[in-house]
Each structure stands twice: as structure tokens, then as C-alpha cells.
Amino acid sequence: MVIIKYTPVSCRSMAVGGVQKRAYNQVVHGIFKISDKDFAVIAGTSVRSLARLRPDDLLPFQTAEVIISLMRAHQKATEIFGSEEKSVEWLKSPNTVLGGISPVQALNSRFGAEEVMDILGRIEYGVYS
């Protein structure tokens, strides 16, 4: 099993190279247990667009960015909270710092992804605000 460290450089390379629908299924359905309908709202796409893709097809760039942001935040949250279950729970729970939306919902844009990573950094270093 290859372990990927989701750094900004590796994430950028991954986005440029493309993310397959297979990875989408592993992340969205396998790790986060999010429905296609809910993910489509988060990613700003349609369920129909997602359904048309075969496992080896590449996701549209914006959708791939959301998947990569999910994995990057998940990796950091797992390091901080010590387990994948706690990571997913935190990422899917409403967060007052994010205006009451969950970190997963905030990951629909680069700005939201930066904000989520910033919050995780503050938690990691014990800076609560």
C-alpha cells in the first residue's frame, strides 16, 4: 500500500494529473460515507455528471480539487485526533468557526480548504479561537 503525504506540491500535481472516479468512490463512499447527492452539492456539480463517469475516467478539475482537499484535511485531522473515525466525525460535524457548516462543506473552495487547514493547525498547536 502506497501512503501519500498530501502536501501542497503533491496536491497540485495530483490535481493537474487528474483524479479517477475510482478514487472518488473510495473517498466519498468508502471513507466519508457521503451520498452522491450530498457530494454534488458540496462540489458544485450534478449527480448525473458524477454517474456518467466510469471508474477509470478522470473527474472534472473542480471536483478533483474537492476530493484532494477532503483527503488532505482527512490526513491532517487523523494525525491530530489519532484515528480515522474521529477525523471523519470532526470533518462532518458543524463547526462554529466556519459559521455553523461542517469542514467537509467548507472544502468546496480553495478559501474554505485553507480555512479548514488553518483550524486544524490551531487545534494541533493548542490555539483555540
Regions found by a protein language model. Give the residues of each.
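Non-transmembrane "mature" sequence context
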Residues: 1-129
